Amino acid sequence: MIKDTRLDPDELLRKIQKEEQKEISGRLKVFFGMVAGVGKTYAMLNAARGLKKEGVDVVVGYIETHGRKETEELLKGLEILPRKKIEHREIEFEEMDIDSILRRKPEVVLVDEFAHTNIPGSRHVKRYQDVIEILNHSINVFTTLNVQHLESQVESVEKNNFCKN
């Protein structure tokens, strides 16, 4: 009797999809801290500068310096993409310009404040949704996140998963 050595079609499809997923998804690196002001953005910018020295194409999609001189210094030498201006209630705000990032298509884009709520009129309600769109275009994203933003989601996760500690 001859042994069938062909791959199972379903297994073959899973392998192909897994390989395609590797090729089409960017990678996410999160700089995580307990509270605002502990140096997440500073650390992210230092990491980005290191990558740039290694020849990696790194751009700034959105950074909030909060007026900190040390943080502003680390921006020097990095390409900063323009922000999108959005008017809301007769006041002009600036948000990250997703389209300029997608057109520029860097290897890595820096996106501060992952949990930020965008101004009404933006493409997405939350910045994390902006990040997902960027990742889906095979662009790697460095971002920052505070523990308090995760803590604020505990009740929602418990409710949606029918569990509670």
Regions found by a protein language model. Name each.
Residues 25-103:
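Conserved P-loop
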Residues 57, 105-108, 134-143:
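Loop/turn-to-beta-strand initiation segments
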Residues 113-128, 146, 152-155:
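Conserved ATPase-coupling elements of RecA-like P-loop NTPase cores
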